[in-house]
């Protein structure tokens, strides 16, 4: 089975401290832990944490803001046509498997 959410998708956070916020997926991370496949996504402007950075010869130290991964189950794809959250489906068009939005039926490029 393919990935439901991939880099470049517009998503909505459905649970957690950033519930209701929208952003674009920067990167999708897959991790295996205790025999389970875990999938996380880094979303722009979501789950921002402060990180202390040591000073080096090339850069100054200080506190920077970084985007941390969020579990894929806590985000939903946003339909660009209707502007609401939607589920993702798969179908074959000309012997090619493509993703589509179940709410509008639009194929996701």
Swiss-Prot record:
Keywords: Ribonucleoprotein, Ribosomal protein, RNA-binding, rRNA-binding. CDD domains: KOW_RPL26. InterPro entries: KOW, Rib_uL2_dom2, Ribosomal_uL24, Ribosomal_uL24_CS, Ribosomal_uL24_KOW, Translation_prot_SH3-like_sf. One of its GO terms (molecular function) is structural constituent of ribosome. It comes from the Bacteria. Pfam families: KOW, ribosomal_L24. This is Large ribosomal subunit protein uL24. It comes from Ehrlichia ruminantium (strain Gardel).
């Amino acid at each position: 089975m393919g990935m439901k959410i991939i880099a470049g998708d517009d998503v909505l956070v459905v649970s957690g401290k950033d519930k209701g916020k929208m952003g674009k997926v920067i990167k999708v991370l897959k991790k295996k832990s205790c025999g389970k496949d875990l999938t996380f996504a880094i979303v722009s402007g979501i789950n921002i944490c402060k990180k202390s950075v040591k000073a080096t010869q090339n850069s100054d130290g200080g506190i920077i803001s970084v985007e941390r991964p969020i579990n894929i189950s806590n985000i939903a794809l946003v339909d660009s046509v209707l502007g609401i959250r939607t589920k993702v489906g798969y179908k074959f068009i000309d012997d090619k498997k493509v993703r589509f939005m179940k709410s509008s039926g639009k194929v996701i490029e």
